Design a protein with these regions (language model features):
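Short acidic/polar mixed-charge low-complexity motifs
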Residues: 1-2, 13, 111
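Short beta-strand scaffold segments in enzyme catalytic cores
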Residues: 2-5, 119-120
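Nucleic acid-binding interface residues in structured DNA/RNA-binding domains
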Residues: 50-158
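Intrinsic disorder/low-complexity segments
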Residues: 5-7, 37, 152-154
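Compact structured core domains
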Residues: 9-55
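Residues in well-ordered beta-strands of folded domains
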Residues: 4, 20, 145
Length: 158
């Protein structure tokens, strides 16, 4: 998986503001600064070990609703999933379109993997990823889910 990492200085402190998956054929560039390089190293470690803990300074920008969705996503254990509707119910949202709005908040997440939006799925399938429901990004989501599920299955063996 190829990624692009965006950083920004906030009051003199560098922060990660975005992580984006790139198409397989995309050319990659060297990280633009030390923080981006650190982020890429941690993402590469995650690829080898889904237990990797990220210790990156993040700038998380979003509405109060989005932040609540993202907090719930961060509480989903590795190897587990919740549906968009389950996340909505955890938030106390009962409107008929609540699952769709949760899906929008998942798609608006600019820090995938670090804020694990891939752990939120549709009631009848994998759902979307980064505002798309097909193509290489859905393959990335499937890979992330399988990567984490395999790690759990391996750990549960006697």
């Amino acid at each position: 998986m190829k990624v692009a990492v965006a950083t920004r200085d906030v009051n003199g402190n560098p922060c990660i503001v975005g992580i984006r998956y790139l198409p397989p054929a995309a050319e990659t560039k060297a990280p633009v600064n030390e923080l981006a390089e650190r982020a890429v190293r941690q993402l590469e470690r995650y690829r080898e070990d889904p237990d990797t803990k990220f210790d990156l300074p993040l700038l998380i920008e979003g509405t109060d609703f989005q932040r609540r969705v993202w907090e719930i996503m961060c509480a989903i254990p590795r190897g587990r999933t919740l549906t968009y509707g389950e996340v909505a119910r955890k938030m106390g949202e009962g409107a008929s379109d609540a699952a769709r709005v949760v899906g929008q908040a998942c798609g608006d997440n600019k820090l995938p993997i670090v804020i694990p939006c891939h752990r939120v799925v549709g009631a009848d399938g994998v759902g979307g990823f980064s505002h798309t429901t097909d193509g290489y990004l859905i393959e990335v989501k499937r890979w992330l889910l399988m990567h984490e599920a395999r790690a759990d299955a391996f750990e549960l063996r006697p």
